[in-house]
């Protein structure tokens, strides 16, 4: 292996970086190939399983890490089931590690949603590629479109179109079509293509395009938000509608999702947008136009429209009807409402993610974390932990961390009000982090990189940590106190 490295390094074979690079190659070549997926899993369905299986089949990926929206999703709605349950289902169906997308980014536009997800993958420093679905199914075409979008999306180009009341996505598409032709512009007609373009843009902007290889799978069975479906694959939107209507959806999801939905229905814990009617109206009626103007995606006088609508609306449907305008998609308006509810400000989106919250993992997920922990830190490095208490402590020294913790806990506490049966607050400190043990699993990592993961509530994990540390300290003390074999022999001779 060292000879291979010397050949690769050429004249730089005696560079101070050589020990690290040699170590890195020895630990990774032929052992791990990690691909990331940025997702929502709302709920986890057969289309997601197809993506995971095809990613492994076509790329040779051995490990899958998911950056998953927490309790709220990018369409501006609460997730059907809480983040801990969705993460648990994911690791039982092919995902190895689930990390939470911070709420301020899960409720952001496509560009910022993608940027945060890519940043978190980059922060692990051991991710080899990113897998995403798209309607076009071609990384080459998506990359061409990403370059075009990056070039034409300037304030000077956008301003004339926006002043005509043209929505931002349509304005971007018009600019791309005008300069690069309709074939490139038409790529932006489809929602998954748009996200795919943003993933590639983010990789390029963050300087990760050479480290994290984009890989796309052509969507099968159903388009995003479509009611069309194959015999086994349907969109999340269609599945949620079936659940809401009380119809059979089992053909489109794994058993774990069927069981979880049944459990949540029985306990009346499914979360729906309509259940937030009163709390949203209450919050909006307590905000001034100036406060609303500080909310992400609010501009061009929209704060005044929201302010007036909240005072006369008698239902959530009425509120949305009074706010909506042609230039703003409904998903954007819904995101604004939840951002306002949680006090998320535009300035919050100028701060990169400050930590990575682990929601679920298995043995391979533990390998990903161990590998990440063995690599040198860089500009994207952030801490990862399953316990939010770790970040509360860090927040005492860093106001950005404390702010992020506050947004997370507040949004989770409000989420518990969104089901028919109201749950206690404190989900982020009581929710169970899943560790799914793989039967017969044997780690191929070197012995010094193996790790034993812990599962349970944050309190249980903290207790296990303390017990491990105590046992380790006791073992070390016993070792120091015990006489060596050589000394014992000398004493016996006396």
Predicted feature locations:
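Non-catalytic positions within long, well-ordered alpha-helices that form the structural scaffold/packing
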Residues: 56-57, 91, 122-123
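Cysteine-centered motifs
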Residues: 2, 12-13
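Active-site cores that bind ATP or allylic diphosphates and position pyrophosphate for catalysis
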Residues: 100-462
């Amino acid at each position: 292996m060292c000879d291979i490295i010397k050949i690769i390094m050429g004249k730089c074979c005696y560079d101070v970086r050589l020990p690290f690079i040699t170590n890195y190659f020895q630990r990774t070549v032929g052992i791990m190939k990690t691909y990331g997926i940025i997702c929502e899993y709302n709920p986890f369905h057969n289309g997601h399983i197809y993506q995971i299986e095809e990613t492994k089949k076509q790329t040779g990926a051995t490990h899958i890490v998911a950056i998953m929206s927490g309790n709220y999703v990018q369409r501006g709605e609460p997730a059907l089931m809480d983040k801990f349950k969705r993460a648990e289902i994911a690791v039982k169906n092919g995902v190895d590690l689930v990390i939470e997308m911070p709420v301020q980014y899960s409720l952001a536009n496509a560009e910022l949603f993608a940027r945060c997800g890519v940043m978190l993958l980059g922060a692990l420093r051991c991710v080899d590629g990113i897998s995403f679905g798209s309607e076009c199914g071609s990384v080459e075409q998506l990359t061409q479109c990403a370059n075009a979008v990056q070039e034409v999306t300037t304030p000077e180009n956008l301003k004339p179109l926006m002043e005509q009341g043209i929505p931002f996505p349509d304005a971007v598409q018009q600019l791309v079509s005008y300069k690069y032709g309709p074939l490139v512009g038409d790529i932006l007609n489809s929602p998954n293509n748009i996200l795919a373009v943003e993933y590639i843009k983010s990789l390029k902007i963050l300087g990760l395009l050479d480290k994290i290889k984009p890989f796309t799978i052509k969507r099968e069975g159903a388009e995003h938000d479509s009611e069309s479906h194959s015999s086994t694959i349907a969109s999340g939107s269609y599945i949620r509608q079936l659940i809401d209507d009380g119809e059979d959806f089992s053909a489109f999801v794994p058993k774990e999702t069927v069981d979880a939905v049944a459990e949540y229905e029985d306990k009346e814990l499914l979360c729906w947008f309509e259940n937030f009617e009163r709390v949203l109206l209450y919050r909006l009626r307590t905000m001034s136009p100036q406060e609303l103007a500080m909310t992400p995606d609010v501009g061009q006088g929209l704060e005044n429209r929201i302010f007036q609508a909240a005072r006369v609306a008698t239902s959530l449907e009425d509120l949305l009807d009074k706010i909506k305008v042609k230039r703003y998609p409904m998903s954007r308006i819904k995101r604004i409402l939840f951002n306002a509810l949680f006090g998320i400000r535009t300035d919050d989106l100028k701060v990169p993610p400050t930590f990575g919250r682990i929601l679920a993992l298995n043995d391979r997920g533990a390998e990903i974390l161990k590998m990440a922990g063995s690599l040198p830190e860089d500009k994207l490095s952030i801490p990862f932990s399953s316990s939010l208490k770790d970040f509360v402590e860090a927040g005492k020294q860093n106001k950005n961390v404390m702010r992020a913790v506050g947004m997370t806990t507040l949004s989770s506490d409000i989420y518990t009000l969104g089901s028919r049966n109201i749950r206690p607050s404190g989900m982020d400190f009581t929710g169970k982090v899943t560790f799914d043990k793989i039967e017969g699993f044997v780690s191929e990592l070197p012995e010094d990189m193996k790790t034993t993961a812990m599962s349970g509530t944050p309190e249980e994990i903290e207790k296990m940590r303390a017990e491990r540390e105590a046992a380790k300290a006791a073992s070390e003390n016993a070792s120091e106190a015990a006489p060596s074999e050589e000394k014992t022999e000398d004493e016996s001779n006396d």
